[in-house]
Amino acid sequence: MYRRRTTALLLAVALWGWFAADAWRTGAQGPAGSLREASPAAGPTAFVCPMHPDYTLDAPGRCPRCGMALVKATPFDVRNYRVDLTTTPAGLRAGQPARWTFRVFRPESDEQVTRFETVHERQYHLFVVSQDMAEFQHVHPLAQADGSWALDVTLPKAGYYKVLSDFMPSGGAAQLIAHPVVTSGFVGDLPSSRARLVPDTALVKTVGDLTATVSFDPDPFVAGLYGHLKFLLADRRGGRPVTDLQTYLGALGHTLIMSEDMVDYVHSHSLDILNAGDEDSEPVFLIPPGADLEAVRGGPEVVFDGLMPRAGRYRAWTQFRRGDVLHTFATTFEVREPAER
């Protein structure tokens, strides 16, 4: 819950018609959160993958899908933690920095949460996406002495935004919580600000010194099934395959996938496994657990998995680090119904 001047508050209230039914939904394999009935309180009983919470063990280990270390948590806990957002100044203006402060509260007791798990080198990931899906930020609030999280954010243009808080409270379940935000004085109407995505026809993209050839497996993606988003990376100048990617937040790549209506989200990291195996076999890792990612495999192919729950159009923002520079690729694609394949 965030504070605004009266005019901005009225705009925010109007936004809930857009967000009320869907603001808390997420992609099935990402951090869980939806408008579902609260489950009874329960203590940590298993070790869970933060990215694939449906995978659990009764002892520490690594996820067979993505290779991430499992953390102790409450599996299948569908309760949403409450996240309060305040901004200083209260009225946000495009192009001007503002201090954003987040406080997290437990669903059963409304007690403020002060302990969080570290997931990919950070305890709090924040995504800021404009409603037309043209603007994207992936940033990280810093822990404050009072248990809150804060950072300075500059919204690049006037309009509506969706803000996604991605964190895992210690002993709880991974969370991906959405907030609507609108800049002060914006007079545009909500429907005309919506994204109208067009699937990419050119799947070779260049950002900075990186050229990426993007592919999908299966092609096209199918709603309700896991698929792979693949990037084959080359140097822009000479065309040679890239093998010198640097790790970014503990992985060779990060991607956020969002549906056109901004209802469904997938937060995924580069896969470290070659074969997930089955219930009777161990996963085969592309990169041995604990190995130096950069030394073992710095490209050229980086693969992400994702499960898009519904047919429609989606946009992915995928980030790679090379030469101490962060490169962000935007990819727009279609997801078909199973019968349409």
Indicate where each model-derived feature is located:
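Intrinsically disordered, low-complexity terminal tails/loops enriched in metal-binding residues
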Residues: M1-R341
